[in-house]
Design a protein with these regions (language model features):
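Short, conserved charged micro-motifs
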Residues: 36, 118-121, 280-287, 313-317
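Conserved PLP-binding catalytic core of the aspartate aminotransferase-like
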Residues: 249, 259-291, 308
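PLP-dependent enzyme catalytic core of the Aspartate aminotransferase-like
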Residues: 142-144, 290, 299-329
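PLP-dependent aminotransferase class I/II
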Residues: 183-266
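N-terminal "arm"/small-domain region of PLP-dependent enzymes with the aminotransferase-like
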Residues: 1-52, 57
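Active-site phosphate-binding strand-loop segment of PLP-dependent enzymes
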Residues: 111-169
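Conserved beta-loop-alpha segment that forms the PLP phosphate-binding cup at the N-terminus of a helix
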Residues: 64-89, 202
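Conserved PLP-anchoring active-site segment centered on the Schiff-base-forming lysine
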Residues: 82-104, 109-111, 116-117, 121
């Protein structure tokens, strides 16, 4: 199984520090709990029904023509490769590693390409997978470029899969409004923007025929009733969404400025995280961990990702820990 952020209990054991003392900055999640409505008893007692209004709420929120709720976008990442015969698949790298692993596991030839390689050899591919904004680099490609790539793939029956897990703070850059185009598949994560990763909910936006095939592959009741109810309420609350969007954008700017102020300029990021690429990334990760501050280390990239602190005391704690850091290089 691949490594992911959020493994706080393991970090607490490794560094022998109480779990309650940790500041977890290892994930790219909104750090503030969303005010949740009361869940009716029927959501717990009855089997989930597909015509409960969740799909309509999701289509309105994402500005999409059709949507399929799934148990986190990870469920779709693992299932989509089973819907194609063996193919030549490129993943725009570096990115969230589950994509390449899922396509390899399903028997496809997987290439990890740069943008330059995609631009030069796109006509050799059956499927292209892009994480946009990129995780962990934060780089974002324009809709125009992605749609150009899609047109090239679709002419030959290919797919463009775009993982937009971190797109909610910049909805104008989303391909969701174009997701009815044949061969274009957009994945959206619910938990990151709404700060509810434990809900395990995501959406696949694509042409109805493909969604029907994916729905059949995933089976009935893929998303539980309480998750469906909560998501529907939050997806229609436009005022709360705008407050969340503004708060996240401000926090992302503050985090970038904080790192810059300590001589640690980010190499990239988005509203939900900032990435440092530097030779001493491992040493900085270790320095922070010994003070019960958990970040996400990417050894292959010599990079460290910082999520957002949840409150003022967390900001001050990170500030003080960074001030004590002395690079060994």
């Amino acid at each position: 199984m691949l490594e992911h952020g959020g493994r706080l209990r393991r970090a607490a054991r490794r560094y022998d520090l109480p779990l309650a003392d940790w500041l977890d900055l290892s994930t790219g999640l909104a750090p503030w709990p969303w005010p949740l409505p009361e869940i009716p008893a029927s959501a717990w007692a009855r089997l989930p029904e597909p015509d409960d209004g969740l799909v309509e709420a999701a289509c309105a929120y994402y500005r999409a023509h059709a949507a399929l709720p799934v148990a986190g976008s990870q469920a779709a990442i693992q299932a989509l490769p089973t819907l194609r015969p063996p193919a030549r698949v490129a993943v725009l790298a570096p990115c969230y590693a589950e994509h390449a692993q899922a396509w390899r596991r399903a028997g496809h030839q997987v290439l990890e390409w740069s943008q330059a390689q995609v631009a030069a050899d796109l006509d050799q591919l059956d499927v292209l997978v892009v994480v946009n904004p990129n995780n962990p680099t934060g780089e974002r490609l324009s809709p125009a470029r992605l749609l150009d790539w899609h047109r090239c793939l679709e002419r030959r029956g290919g797919w463009l899969v775009v993982d937009e897990a971190f797109m909610d703070t910049t909805p104008g850059a989303s391909l969701a409004p174009f997701s009815d185009l044949p061969g274009l598949i957009v994945l959206r994560s619910f938990g990151k923007f709404f700060g509810l990763a434990g809900l395990r909910l995501g959406f696949v936006l694509a042409a109805p025929a493909l969604l029907e095939r994916l729905d059949e592959q995933l089976g009935p009741w893929a998303v539980n009733g309480p998750s469906r109810y909560l998501a529907q309420q939050l997806l229609v609350d436009r005022e709360a969404q705008q407050r969340q969007r503004e708060a996240l954008l401000q926090a992302g700017e503050r985090l970038a400025a904080l790192l810059e102020g300590h001589g640690l300029p980010p190499s990239g990021g988005c509203a939900l995280f900032q990435l440092l690429r530097r030779p001493d990334a491992s040493a900085l990760h270790e320095h922070l961990a010994r003070q019960a501050i958990f970040t996400r280390l990417f050894p292959d990239l010599a990079a460290l990702r910082f999520g957002l602190p949840a409150d003022e005391s967390a900001w001050q704690r990170l500030d003080a820990a960074l001030a004590r850091y002395r690079s060994p290089l």
